Amino acid sequence: DCAADRSGAVAAVGKYIYEHYRTHRLVAGNDSRLAAMPWRDAGVLPRFGALEPGEPVALSYARLAIAETGVVVTFTGRANPAANNLLSENHIVLVDGADLVPDMEAGWACINALIAEEGRPRGINMIAGPSSTADIEGKLVQGAHGPRQWHVIPCRWFFGGDSIE
């Protein structure tokens, strides 16, 4: 999925969670960008806060993404509880096109600039895919230490509304 605007992002999230979980419910952090999304347009029912046991889908907003490695970077704290990144069965991440950087060096420069501007976050997560391990008898196991599935939705717009095209 690639969304052209906020409505497209909401539609992509709604379609994905319904196809995989037959639900319109998810948990989203207290990020103001997520709160401003037109969730009702797609019938999505977000609960804002930290993931609780039994809730399979969490939604986050990436601070940036690194093209070279496919990594998304999230800062943890009140706006993005660590549990949402690490404990859900399925983690969905929205990434603004304006927040895409070419490589790790540019990623670290951006992280340092964000920290200088906003202060140090509780934690920094660099996520490159769903959790997996092959430690047990050499057999690949998904979801061993985190989400079994990971879905990134790039958005071709700045949150402020200006298109990057």
Regions found by a protein language model. Give the residues of each.
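The feature marks the mature, well-folded catalytic cores of soluble enzymes
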Residues: D1-E165
